[in-house]
Amino acid sequence: MKSKIVGVIAIVLVFALDQVSKAYAIDWYSQSGATEIFKFCSLVEVWNRGISFGMFGALESSNLIFTYVSLGVILMLFVLFVQSKCNKSTICMGVVIGGALGNLADRLRFGAVYDFVSLHAGEFHWPAFNFADVCVTCGVICFLCLEIMYHAKACVDTSGDPDALSVKKY
């Protein structure tokens, strides 16, 4: 139960930080325009109507389609979140859900996701992203690492405590 509370806190915290960071970036951009923060990092303004890297953004009704897809994914993740018996996985899912909700809020409010961080080196430019994107990516990576470490190695619960998993020796 404690992990569910921590997971819910992660959802709320990630969502809130994402929305605050976007509000700050929108305000900054409206006053200062694109700004170089470091030699390799700039504050920019990109309204992403598609999915990752702006794919399918030109698709007619893309916002409506991706809003429904986002809702479906969030609902599926929430079901997994509620059913999860692994405390660490619950927290990872909370981070992913919080980020997904942040981007969904943009779609509902603006009709697109607001991206504002641009990483670049010379002629190389990574597509713009936001705090929610970072949280979704990190949460998924952490979740996959947990799956590989615990489940792919045939973990067993010896104590009834989801955090006390031990690896089966073959």
From Swiss-Prot:
Its main location: membrane. The active site is at residues 115, 133. Coiled coil: none annotated. GO terms for cellular component: plasma membrane. It comes from the Bacteria. Its EC number is 3.4.23.36. Keywords: Aspartyl protease, Cell inner membrane, Cell membrane, Hydrolase, Membrane, Protease, Transmembrane, Transmembrane helix. GO terms for biological process: proteolysis. It is a multi-pass membrane protein. It catalyses: Release of signal peptides from bacterial membrane prolipoproteins. Hydrolyzes -Xaa-Yaa-Zaa-|-(S,diacylglyceryl)Cys-, in which Xaa is hydrophobic (preferably Leu), and Yaa (Ala or Ser) and Zaa (Gly or Ala) have small, neutral side chains. It comes from Anaplasma marginale (strain St. Maries). It is an enzyme of class 3 (hydrolase). The keyword Metal-binding does not apply. Belongs to the peptidase A8 family. InterPro entries: Peptidase_A8. Pathway: Protein modification; lipoprotein biosynthesis (signal peptide cleavage). Pfam families: Peptidase_A8. GO terms for molecular function: aspartic-type endopeptidase activity. This protein specifically catalyzes the removal of signal peptides from prolipoproteins. The gene is lspA. The chain crosses the membrane at residues 5-25, 62-82, 89-111, 126-146. This is Lipoprotein signal peptidase. It is found in: Cell inner membrane.
